[in-house]
């Protein structure tokens, strides 16, 4: 049975090993779109947008997927002492990486919006599955963790409904694999790690992963612009509201 690839919204699913591959891919994307509709930052009807527009002190109901993502995000925020923080959204809004001639925001605007950043401004109610902000102006953005969650849930769907298949799910830096690669004796899948600032498809390293494993890569080269000979990238430091200065151009986690 041959394989098929489908690309939607920068998400790629390649699958094979079963006759109804199109149904497999379509079903996996349905799982993704359901999650996306809830965690979208831009869809006014999403769970995230409803929370973002809610006033302080008023609990906002979370759907099961959004609750799980927020719960895990807060765990990571605490473990990293705030280096990862989903409340970075008010500062993110100041940074424009899409315009033809982007410029960094004024420092006074960053400072003004930093007062809304801090995961301690969130109260997650595990019993009622609600999220409450303690001050007005707090917003969350699940873009830093939602993609990986959606990728994992899509893989679980494939595993449950098409156990004899194989699949590669590439969701913009989040790569999960399932099953046995028919082109490899050991069944592994080879994933290339993009060379920072090089042409797309130029890899710094090739890594083999097996069924159920994943590799996630993020880097300063993915969304960035130069201004006055300085590189400004999209990975913001919640403590400063400016691009992080870790010294790394790319980090991958297996």
Locate each region found by the language model.
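Mature catalytic core of soluble alpha/beta enzymes
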Residues: 3-254
